[in-house]
Amino acid sequence: MNIYTITPKYHITGVLKPESMTQLQRLGIVKVICNRPDSEAPLEEHSERMRSAVTEAGIAFEYNPVTMTSFSPELVRRQTDAVLNTNSGVFAYCATGRRCTMLWAFEFAHQRAPEDLI
């Protein structure tokens, strides 16, 4: 699994597998946010199966599915609240990591210099 650190608190990846929970625990992740709609995931990666794997590992789970055509202020706010209401490691995933990054950028990018974002 390729993990990308957007900030010390917010990490992303593309596809997350149930067998990756030990790695998330070692990273100190306390919340996982799934941005991948069930309609584009294989059955073994559907949100409820992932919720089970994540919560069995003692990590909180939130489902905030986003498609490239469904971005909305409400979805951005839900993602933002999930990050701000957590004191330490948040891990978001979708198919490639792009939507997780965009959700973060819509709310937080203005707080950083452009050269830090590129």
Which residue ranges define each predicted feature?
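Cys-dependent protein tyrosine phosphatase-like superfamily
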Residues: 1-91, 99-118
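Short cysteine clusters
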Residues: 94
